[in-house]
A protein has these predicted regions:
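Thiol-based oxidoreductase modules, predominantly thioredoxin-like and allied folds used
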Residues: 78-102
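Bacterial N-terminal signal peptides that target proteins for export
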Residues: 3-20
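Solvent-exposed loop/turn segments at secondary-structure junctions
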Residues: 57-60, 86-91, 128-131
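Bacterial N-terminal signal peptides
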Residues: 19-30
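Ligand-binding face of N-terminal immunoglobulin V-set domains in extracellular IgSF glycoproteins
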Residues: 122
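Local sequence-structure signature of Cys/Sec-based thiol-disulfide redox active-site neighborhoods
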Residues: 43-84
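Boundary at the C-terminal end of the N-terminal hydrophobic targeting segment
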Residues: 32-35
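Short, conserved sequence motifs used for protein processing/export or organelle targeting and
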Residues: 95-115, 127-266
Length: 266
């Protein structure tokens, strides 16, 4: 199977495994359904996680289902990641779109050779793309990719009496993926929006896990590395996460859990 292509045909080949996957994730969602809207996303140190990106837009008729699915997956603790709203297909008012989201999606088209861009598109670990509103396909893709690709957890240590964090990365053997870049992603507070126009006009939608800014912290060659940085959060930010991505293959190599601002945690 070519992991650089959507898993549209793959999902039907292992129905028993898929059923078990769906039942497992259903239990995650059932447990978290009554939880607070802001979940604490954390993973034990050095345990692999799954990194999910959703390329979405308010103008897309299928996107609300994908946005909700992304929120459920992240809140369940099954994955970390964000929703990235593209600007080439968007509403005229109340837009959440960002030009860098369109660029990231175009970069994935090149990395994955996945054909024309579309929404909603979900990218798993930077390796596989799948239609973001197709729950069965998304869950099967997550299960499959988590078995073939390891995304290490980055532990961020807040420094005492400071707004800085320490990042420590162990050396890894990933020569084919180097060089890589270490990114800081700012995650917004939830957006409660009545969509003004387009396919979802008039719908009241709560958008969660929206990334509004990404910033490159520094390059990485795969060697052991420790450095500090200040996220400089604003009131509009729920929190942030740090992730490492190959500049050669687009593969996500490591990620922190969502680090929430004090206002979001209170």
């Amino acid at each position: 199977m070519n992991i650089n292509r959507p898993l549209y045909n793959y999902v039907n080949k292992e129905p028993l495994k898929l059923l078990l996957t769906l039942l497992t994730l259903w239990s995650f969602f059932a447990v978290t359904a009554g939880a607070e809207e802001t979940a604490e996303l954390s993973s034990p140190d050095n345990q692999p996680i799954v990194f999910v990106e959703l390329f979405s837009t308010q103008a897309c008729g299928f996107c609300p289902d994908a946005d909700k699915l992304l929120s459920d997956i992240i809140q369940s603790g099954k994955a970390v990641g964000f929703g990235c709203h593209v600007d080439y297909f968007d509403v005229k008012e109340g837009s959440l779109s960002q030009p860098f989201c369109s660029k990231r999606q175009a970069d994935y088209t090149r990395f994955l050779q996945s054909g024309p861009t579309y929404t909603p598109q979900m990218i798993i670990n930077g390796l596989v793309d799948v239609m973001g509103h197709k729950t069965q396909q998304v869950l099967e893709a997550i299960d499959h990719v988590s078995n073939i690709s390891t995304v290490s957890t980055i532990a961020l240590q807040p420094l005492e009496d400071s707004d800085h964090y320490q990042v420590s990365l162990d050396a890894i053997d990933a020569e084919d993926d180097m060089p890589a870049a270490i990114w800081l992603a700012y995650i917004d507070q939830d957006h409660d929006i009545t969509v003004a126009d387009g396919a979802n006009r008039g719908q009241d939608i709560i958008y969660k896990n929206i990334v509004s800014k990404v910033k490159e912290l520094q390059a990485w060659d795969g060697g052991a590395l420790t450095f500090t940085f200040s996220p400089m959060l604003e009131e509009s930010h729920k929190g942030f996460l740090v992730f490492v991505q190959s500049q050669i293959t687009g593969k996500i190599l490591a990620s922190s859990p969502l680090m929430q601002s004090e206002d979001s945690e209170s």
